[in-house]
Amino acid sequence: AQSFRNEQGFRKKKEGWLIKVITYQSEAVLRILKSGQVYRAHKSLSFGKQYGALVDILQLNCESPVFGCLKYHRRCTNGKVSSSVKFLLEVPAEKVKLTEYSVWADFLYAQKFTLAEDYSHVAGLCQELDQETLDKMIHSLQKQKRPWQYRIPQAVLEEIRPEWVIK
């Protein structure tokens, strides 16, 4: 079990470590959580292939991931739009996968150059992307490190549970 002792944004409970995650979601998500139900994202129409690839890479059990950032860490974007609601969550550490934000952004772009049915293979001869670079991106997304080892960590969750919401 990983120890996050002396790292800001982590708290130890008898059940294990909790990580503070900030996420912006719609008001519909707020209603779901207030009703005591678990929120799980539906498959994205726009990014279905990319999100499905990330679900596979991180071995998640969901249709589509829920994204957030870690409190007290650098963030590239906050994900806020005018109609969104900010949630502060305390999530059990084993329920949080982390990726490097810039690698995820590069991977999203790279998917334009992969086979339609296989995110892990470059489609034919491509000047914009070679197989070695794609393999390195996938490996980087898979490899889980301590939060402070990421330049800009992105939190990836399978779901949001009502008991995780602290604000």
Where does each model-flagged region fall?
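ADP-ribosyltransferase catalytic core
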Residues: 50-124
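ADP-ribose/NAD+-binding catalytic cleft of ART/PARP-like enzymes
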Residues: 1-63
